[in-house]
Amino acid sequence: MDYNIELYKKDSKNEYRYALGVLSERTLFVIGLNPSTADEQSPDPTIRKVMGFAERNNYTSFVMLNLYPQRSPYPDDLPYEADKDELKKNITIISDLIKSQKEANVLLAWGNNVYSRAYLLESLNLIYKNAIFSNH
């Protein structure tokens, strides 16, 4: 799978990344904890793993999303309180992208760090309600 990013949603300061990838007829949506360093030019180790997984499982593209959009290669550096506006924007973007597909395959991909901040589980709950299991 080539790294030809067509979908790159971020804030103006590049502190928050909401979506990274390509939409196609067979897209794998991956929801991680938070974005690290990947951008539209260069993948990071997580994105390389996602690309390999998607390719091995016959997906033609991927879109990387996250429970919280703040960039940090170290999840422990995330704030203890979420920026509610950023969280809301992130949920809206995720919901819109997933709902835009006739059929959406979603891979949830994070470790125990999901329990480190209450808003991460809150975000998961909102994604579940608004995007994954709502009526298209």
Segments predicted by a language model, with ranges:
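Glycine/proline-rich loop-helix segments at beta-alpha junctions forming the active-site rim
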Residues: D2, S72, L78-H136
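Active-site and ligand/interface coordination hotspots across diverse enzymes
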Residues: M1-D44, R56
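Hydrophobic/aromatic beta-strand patches that form the interior of the parallel beta-sheet core
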Residues: F29-I31, V63-L65, L107, I132
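Short catalytic helix/loop segments, enriched in acidic residues and glycine
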Residues: I47-E55
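Short, well-ordered beta-to-alpha junction loops that form the rim of enzyme active sites
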Residues: L33, L67, W110-N112
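Short connector loops at secondary-structure junctions
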Residues: T60-D76
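Amphipathic coiled-coil/heptad-repeat helices and related helical stalk/stem segments
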Residues: T46-I47, N90
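A general structural motif
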Residues: E25-R26, Y59, K102-N105
